A protein has these predicted regions:
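Alpha-helical secondary-structure segments
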Residues: 20-26, 51-55, 98-99, 131-136, ...
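Gly/Pro-rich hinge or "lid" segments in bacterial periplasmic/extracellular proteins
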Residues: 71-136, 146, 254-256, 260, ...
Length: 443
């Protein structure tokens, strides 16, 4: 199996050197050697140059490879710089191919980007396939949300890459600001430890799941968050409503069913204290919560839902990295996790995988399903397989999708021609400017 890439003449780095097919080969080989993301293109066996083409030989089809190559963390560097520079020198001294290059950097404060005048793109979304008309960009790192929100309204800033949630309503109402959805797929979910004494019985895990009301959860969430009914979300490749329907049909809110499942397992309220008990002990467990606003709101909602069926959920809040480590170590009962990516294989590689023993009762067959889907060329067939993988995860009753995280970007309405996508794509190639390069209020 082969993949052919063409590198037309005229594409240049900011140094003025032309992009050569050999640069792609050198960049991939370097990435396979040092990159933590190398698994995203590990199927490449060999590469050869044929004129302006690179023929890539693959051991097998890898569905996530193309997505990985268009991501910002996979760049192309001049072969000479790869060979001559040390790793430290590359960090600040190399010149990856792109629309802009770094001209100045003040740590913790700002960076100045300058347009690469030798840049060419094949992006079909852009009419202008050449250098950006915006010649200089100042990217500001430090500042308070209030400063950014007022700054974009007053003209101190032209664009906010991320709208602060607490200023969303104010910026949306401002006549001089355009605001758009600009965030990839990110699902927040919990995993249950099926090796824990309380959760070894799948019907107990089902009782937990059926106790959760997403209508109640929605009351706690902001414009940036909506309840999730699947693990692969609407802005992710291979999303399917079938997965949503399956989850809602089989694992939707049903407090009475939750109570019945608990009672069938011997959990009833024998002392009328509002909590179910068994063998003299109340049903009490610990929720390992990330120290983030969304997670804390979810925890409050779940705590209320579970109390309604007689379960006492106690909340432990800590830094997200400690929550993740608790799951890896198996030191958890229910833990709040999150994954953000708009391509499904990174997701299905990680769901119920931080600690397989605690969360995945059938890893061999699960991994086989993922491997088969990754090799599937047809998109629709692959979507069916991703949906089947989600159903398998749901049926484990060790993972519960909870929140679909969203985000927004805004800019001043006087700037015309920005091309953007709901998943965060942001392109300046078609911005309207006058003869002097001004992009504000150009008619």
């Amino acid at each position: 199996m082969t993949w052919t890439l063409t590198f037309p003449e005229g594409m240049k780095y900011s140094t003025g050197e032309q992009v050569e097919p050999e640069d792609f080969i050198a960049s991939v080989e370097y990435g396979l050697e040092v990159s933590p993301y190398a698994d995203g293109y590990r199927a490449i066996e060999s590469m050869e140059v044929d004129g302006r083409n690179v023929i890539v030989h693959l051991s097998e089809y890898q569905a996530d490879m193309l997505y990985n190559f268009q991501s910002v963390f996979v760049g192309m560097i001049d072969k000479d710089e790869i060979e001559k520079m040390s790793a430290d020198e590359k960090l600040w001294g190399c010149h990856p191919y792109g629309a802009y290059y770094l001209d100045e950097y003040q740590p913790g404060a700002y960076a100045i980007l300058k347009a690469n005048e030798g840049y060419k793109t094949n992006n079909p979304m852009l009419k202008n396939q050449g250098p950006s008309p915006i010649k200089t960009i100042k990217v500001v790192f430090s500042g308070e949300s209030f400063t950014f929100a007022q700054g974009v309204k007053n003209g101190d800033y032209d664009v906010l890459s991320t709208v602060p949630s607490e200023y969303y309503d104010e910026l949306k109402a401002a006549e001089n600001i355009d605001i758009f959805e600009a965030y990839g797929a990110e699902v927040n979910y919990v995993e249950l430890n099926m090796t824990d004494t309380l959760f070894q019985d799948i019907n107990i895990r089902k009782a937990i799941i059926h106790a959760i009301s997403r209508n109640n959860l929605a009351k706690y969430l902001s414009e940036f968050e909506t309840p999730a009914h699947s693990l692969v979300l609407r802005k992710c490749l291979n999303y399917s409503e079938e997965a949503v329907d399956y989850y809602d049909t089989n694992y939707g809110y049903d407090a009475e069913l939750s109570k019945k499942l608990l009672a069938d397992a011997g959990w009833t309220d024998t002392n009328n204290d509002g909590f179910v008990d068994k063998d003299g002990k109340n049903f009490v467990f610990e929720f390992d919560c990330r120290d983030l606003e969304t997670a804390k709101k979810v925890a409050q909602s779940l705590q209320i839902d579970l109390k309604a069926v007689g379960i006492d959920m106690q909340i432990k809040t800590q830094n997200w990295s400690y929550v993740n480590q608790d799951v890896v170590d198996g030191n958890f009962q229910m833990a709040y996790l999150g994954l953000g990516w708009s391509e499904p294989f990174l997701l299905v590689d990680n769901f119920c995988s931080r600690n397989v023993e605690c969360t995945n009762p059938d890893p061999e067959n699960y991994n086989a399903m993922v491997a088969k889907a990754r090799k599937t060329v047809d998109y629709d067939e692959r979507t069916e397989q991703i949906t089947a993988i989600q159903k398998k995860l749901f049926d484990y009753c060790t993972i519960i999708p909870l929140v679909d995280i969203n985000g927004y970007r805004c800019w001043r309405t006087e700037i015309q021609g920005i091309v953007h996508t709901p998943t965060g794509g942001f392109y300046l190639g078609d911005v309207v400017t006058d003869a002097d390069g001004n992009f504000r209020n150009v008619k």
